[in-house]
Structure formats: C-alpha cells, structure tokens
Amino acid sequence: MDINLNYSEDESPLSLKSDFILSLCELIVGGREGLQPIEKTVIDRCVRMVYQAYLNEPRPENVPILGDLHRILLEQPEKEARLIATALEIYVSGSLNVFNHRTNVNIQNRLVCFDIKELGKQLKKIGMLIVQDQVWGRVTANRADGRATRYYMDEMHLLLKEGRILQTYAKRELANYQVFD
C-alpha cells in the first residue's frame, strides 16, 4: 500500500490512494453491484486513519500494509466494517496473503519487471491492480523529476478483460490530458 506523496499535482495523494484502495476492495468485496455507499465511507475513513502515521513521518517503515487496514476496520462500529474486514481476512492472514507486506521490489531501478504470471486466479486481478498503482506512482515521481517514463506491457489483453482495472487505469491517464473545444 505504498504511497507516493507526489502522486498528483492536482489531487491529494491520500485521496488518490483512497480511490485505489476502494478499487481494491471493490474487487474483493464488491460483487456485481460494487461497494455500497456506507462501505465506501467506512473504507475511506479507515484509509485516512491508517495513513496518518506515515503522513506525519514519511518513512518506509511507516507505510501501512493491508493488515493495518484490516485491524482498523475491525475497530469501527459499523457492521459493514466487520464484513469488509472479514472479506479481507484471506488476503491478510489467510492463504492469499502474498500482498500483506511492504514491497520488496526496488522500483527506483531504471528497469523494473513485474511478473504476475504465477499468481493464481484469485490473485491475478488484484496483482494487475497493484502493478498499475506501482507504475502510476513511478510515472508521477519521474514526472516530478522531469523524466520520461516508458511503460511496456505484455499480455495487455488481460488488462482489457478486466473492466474495473481498466477503468481505474484510464481514469488516471485521462486526468492528465486536456481536451480543447
């Protein structure tokens, strides 16, 4: 759940990270109808709470992990919070907990390869969403430094098959372009 404080020139990095985590939770919890308004509100509140320590002191060891969000959800009074936490449990302490840690990938390298081939069916969509978030963080950091970023994606059809992931990606990309009448 890394956060780049230069995530956007226009929007709050925390708002964008909350939007990402809402997309993540929508994949996990949402079902066909997606997240309900109360669920979105609870998740947004918990995201703001879980990132507070990092925003006060932005050090790598303060970056929250999914387990921190899970813990804060369990502390909330709404029954929806408990349902969301229960849905996240398999990704926090269950058999699909591969993303419940700080990243071990050095994304500062000039060339980074994300390989999600070995992720099982249950994790592939989440893996694609996380990769898109990491790439976006790198693009914004490079933009702040005046550097171009080249992004090559093999198996693009996997991204195109997933409407929610593609929607999240497109929303971020299109926000950077101006349309002139």
Predicted regions and their residues:
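P-loop NTPase motor domains
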Residues: 2-179
